[in-house]
Amino acid sequence: MKMRSSDERIARETAAGLWGTDTLHSLLARNAAATPDREAVVDQPNKAELTGAEARRLTVQELDRVSSACARELASRGITAGDRVVVQLPNTSELIVLYYALSKLGAAMSPTAVQYGAHELSHFKAALAPKALITVTELRGAPLAQQARDALGDTPVWDVTDDLDVYAGMDEDAAGDWADDANAPLTVAWTSGTTGTPKGVPRSHNMWLAQGRLTSYAGEFADGERFLSPFPMINMASLGGFLFPSALHNCTLVLHHPLDIPLYLAQLQDEKINYTLAPPPLLNRLAQQPEMWEQFDYSALRVIGSGSVPLSPAMIDVFESRFGKTIINFYGSNEGIALISTRENSPSPEHRATLFPRLGAEGVNFKSYAEGAIRTRINDPDTGEVISEPGVPGELCVFGPGVFDGYLDHDGEGVFTADGYFRSGDLVEICPEQPTHYRIVGRCKDIINRGGVKLSPSELDGLLEGALGLAEAAVCAYADEDLGEKVCACVVPLEDAEPPTLETVREHLSSKGVARFKLPERLEVFAALPRNPLGKVMRNVLREQVESRG
């Protein structure tokens, strides 16, 4: 189980001044000493509707104290340095308290999506061997705690609703003999891969802080600003984009989840937010219906980040020329990809919408945090040769202080180049019209990108094949205006068998514990699936056939 960087890497990054001794919780202690009464975390006002718990507003000092008390309680239950704890919570203050509490203990937190069911939780247990799982009794009626107990068997499940009070000890001293290793794993996030199951991505404090500094540089964050986080606090977008910048700059973290557009727009105004992220479909809608935006007072708001799919140049133009708000385009991953297109490095809305600076590429210079330490290039995915000619697609490869060391329990084959660059699996090209920038072309693999959430098609293939009277089955992406891509189930019935309905397919996958957001939203029946000479389904051809049907 690879959970820690090599001594060689630690020495290299430390000597370069890119890694240090700060931890997530040491930053909190520093902030609490400087501004004890500044707000640190603010719950969404509809929290009671989500979990039944009251919405809270914690100062920096209160967050430091309750996270220390929570750490002591977890220690009394057997959690120690090096342990792994799965946490399945929505964006609420309890989740933030647990990040800091587990950081203080030196334990690794594995945050998971609240949509995940028994199928995914069982996999996490097998891969991670967690000491416990922490969740909530119900989320909008969904019995998360009971679902986890059913899936995990003898692994303890602790419920923040009525079993684990993370707010106890509000008046206790925050000081303690806390962990101080910035190179220890802080999180194990999860990402989908072509193996058909999510892969664990261990990341240390130093890796996360490198990403947080890069985001902070791009957003020009200042001390004491206020952030609104509408995305699940479980991956690069929210951890590298909100949690760590908030700790680095002593900022207030206002929470929101799941996306409720009227509430989100109201929070932006009422909480006097300076920075937020927003999904492209929402930004497009606001640009097309400016009256939705202009009914509010957003004078405090400076910057909005977005990404996951190409942005609209027209949207960027409306936000910047009419609304006076800067748009940043992010392209990242849990493994440590962090391409950022800003007003400074990509002034044109047309370029910023679809292109990203070639950070650290030979002959290309952009100002950034860790300038010269973050390097990117394009390799031929088959030969490994470096591609320097514009317009020739290849695999994006990344090297830098924010890049992880490798997947959990993985042999590393195909993950890194011989000289240590992470092979992203994403196809990019040097833009012929703007050779200082990359253009995203597609993906080397077949991952489905549903609204920024990447899904593994082979995982669903395996659950459909041999079931429901099917001779063959595979899923593929199809284009969707709002989410970018959705899932289509492509089936070949056994001879003389009736094809299943879409509802039957969805019910079957649900019975296997598959999360709702992974379920197919379209069904197509075929006489045979397109395959290559080795018998592998040609998913790109399959997608073309699906989309040709309208």
Please report, for each region that a protein language model flagged, where it lies by residue.
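ANL superfamily adenylate-forming
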Residues: 6, 45-52, 56, 139-182, ...
